[in-house]
Regions:
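Glycine-rich, proline-tolerant flexible connector loops at the mouths of alpha/beta enzymes
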Residues: 30-32, 56-83, 181, 185-187
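Alpha-helix-loop-beta-strand connector modules within alpha/beta enzyme cores
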Residues: 70-98, 103-107, 131-141, 156, ...
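N-terminal amphipathic alpha-helix/helix-capping segment at the start of soluble metabolic enzymes
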Residues: 1-27, 170
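Active-site mouth loops of central-metabolism enzymes
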Residues: 26-45, 70, 95-97, 147-153
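Short, well-ordered coil/turn segments that N-cap beta-strands
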Residues: 16-20, 55-56, 90-95, 113-115, ...
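Conserved, mostly hydrophobic/aromatic
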Residues: 24, 50, 54, 99, ...
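Active-site glycine- and acidic-residue-rich loops that bind
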Residues: 35-41, 118-124, 147-157, 181-199
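Acidic (Asp/Glu)-rich catalytic clusters
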Residues: 51-52, 110-111, 126-135, 169
Length: 211
């Protein structure tokens, strides 16, 4: 029996092991490291540190999505990441994920060498179209569904997005699902998700969990 993989551009990540995703916020206002890595040199140095510490892939974002954030424009988001992205691709040797919900930014990120798109809004039609025109991996986050059992809701959202992705021509092995702990959910729902996360997983697809 073949081991399922997460296919992200030229990278094929077997799903019989766990990978650590290093988070690189090229923003002034992220809750964890806002302002530290606005300089491309500092950002690259941090990415290489995370690789040395065991990261198997790097996620870079130019827009904070902390609770209560104020969205910036696609142009400003791209301005923040455009100089560091090619260096990350060239120097780390790791799959580089770009955290964006803007299709315009996503297209430019792929052209700059990103292997993965990470959309906290769950890949609407325009983002699916961008992804379908490439071989990138797609991290699909549940942005906060409503009504009923939280695990069933999240899994239902994932299955809906799986169907939409496949209709767009995106193969199952290119999909990774993130239950979005802390996004659009109550404290009780977040705890329930963490305790019963196996109920939300989609067979044959990668799964991402924030820590």
């Amino acid at each position: 029996m073949n081991t399922p993989v997460f296919q992200a551009g030229e990278f094929s990540l077997p799903l019989d092991r766990t990978y650590v995703m290093g988070i690189l916020n090229v923003t002034p206002d992220s809750f964890s490291d806002g302002g530290k890595y606005l300089d491309p040199t500092a950002a690259l140095e941090r990415a290489l540190e995370m690789k040395a510490e065991g990261a198997g892939l790097i996620d870079v974002g130019g827009q904070s999505t902390r609770p209560g954030y104020t969205a910036i424009s696609p142009e400003e988001e791209w301005e923040r990441i455009r100089d560091v992205l090619p260096a990350l691709v060239k120097k780390t040797g790791l799959p580089i994920s770009v955290d964006t919900f803007y299709p315009w930014v996503a297209q430019r990120a792929l052209e700059a060498g990103a292997s993965i798109l990470n959309d906290v809004r769950g890949f609407g039609p325009e983002m699916l179209a961008v992804a379908a025109g490439s071989r990138c991996g797609c991290i699909v986050m549940d942005p906060g569904t409503t009504g009923g059992d939280i695990c069933a809701r999240v899994r239902g959202f994932f299955l809906d997005r799986l169907e939409a992705a496949q209709r767009a021509g995106i193969a199952r092995e290119r999909l990774c699902f993130d239950p979005g702990v802390g996004f659009g959910k109550t404290v009780e729902e977040n705890l329930d998700l963490i305790a019963h996360v196996e109920r939300t997983k989609v067979e044959g697809c990668a799964f991402l969990m924030a820590a």
